[in-house]
């Protein structure tokens, strides 16, 4: 046996630890945490190398998944009549039912229907800078610390919302700028109803603003439409529906929205 294979030799002679499999399983389970920590903490050249390695891993994984999905797709449903005769390229797809093509066309059709279903009244809105969105709050004994921010726009918080302790609250959402209801207009019925807001679905400015519940022009919100008496095709009452804010709530002092139907 070569000299550099002493570990394999020792395993063959004495075997492994009794808890080897358990230790190996736990190490593999911790691998995700280690990768996440490296992604957050690495700096400089090591971070670049790590990002490059992760990018190549993700690309290879995507290729494997795509190849696996393509292998599942069936080929022509009926075999060719004469196997021995070679057909030219322009005759290969004639009189054959390819499931992959049907699947691709159905996916495209569904995407078009989805885009048409959720077309919004305001497709584009003005961008808002962080200086306009947040106000710096000075804290500390001598007012030298400036890690706190106060949102200057109207926000929505849920029913069970509780503020964090003052010394740990980084972003302040003032109680005076919180909204619970919106003036929602139904485009087909032509009526405007004062409906309670259920949540913020999407803020076009940033995902962080969506998480904070900031209400700006163009934001998609979910409202309670049970008062309108809308019913589905199956006869069930519609509870929540999406609406888009069409005004500037911080200027008008109220939220006006159009229901997406």
Swiss-Prot record:
* BP-aspect Gene Ontology terms: maturation of 5.8S rRNA from tricistronic rRNA transcript (SSU-rRNA, 5.8S rRNA, LSU-rRNA); maturation of LSU-rRNA from tricistronic rRNA transcript (SSU-rRNA, 5.8S rRNA, LSU-rRNA)
Motif Nuclear localization signal 1 mapped to chain: 15-22
What's the domain of life for this entry? Answer: Eukaryota
Family indicated by similarity? Belongs to the eukaryotic ribosomal protein eS8 family. Ribosome biogenesis protein NSA2 subfamily.
Q: Name one GO cellular component term.
A: preribosome, large subunit precursor
| Entries under InterPro entries matching the protein | NSA2_fam, Ribosomal_Se8/biogenesis_NSA2
- Motif (Nuclear localization signal 2) positions are 51-58
Q: What species was this sequence derived from?
A: Lodderomyces elongisporus (strain ATCC 11503 / CBS 2605 / JCM 1781 / NBRC 1676 / NRRL YB-4239)
Q: Where is the composition biased (Basic and acidic residues)?
A: 7-37
Biological function:
Involved in the biogenesis of the 60S ribosomal subunit. May play a part in the quality control of pre-60S particles.
Q: Which UniProt keywords apply?
A: Nucleus, Ribonucleoprotein, Ribosome biogenesis, rRNA processing
State what protein this is by name: Ribosome biogenesis protein NSA2
Where would you find this protein in the cell? Nucleus, Nucleolus
Please give the subunit comment from the record. Answer: Component of the pre-66S ribosomal particle. Interacts with NOP7 and RRP1. Interacts with RSA4 (via WD repeats).
Pfam families per UniProt: Ribosomal_S8e (PF01201)
Give positions of region: Disordered: 1-38, 56-84
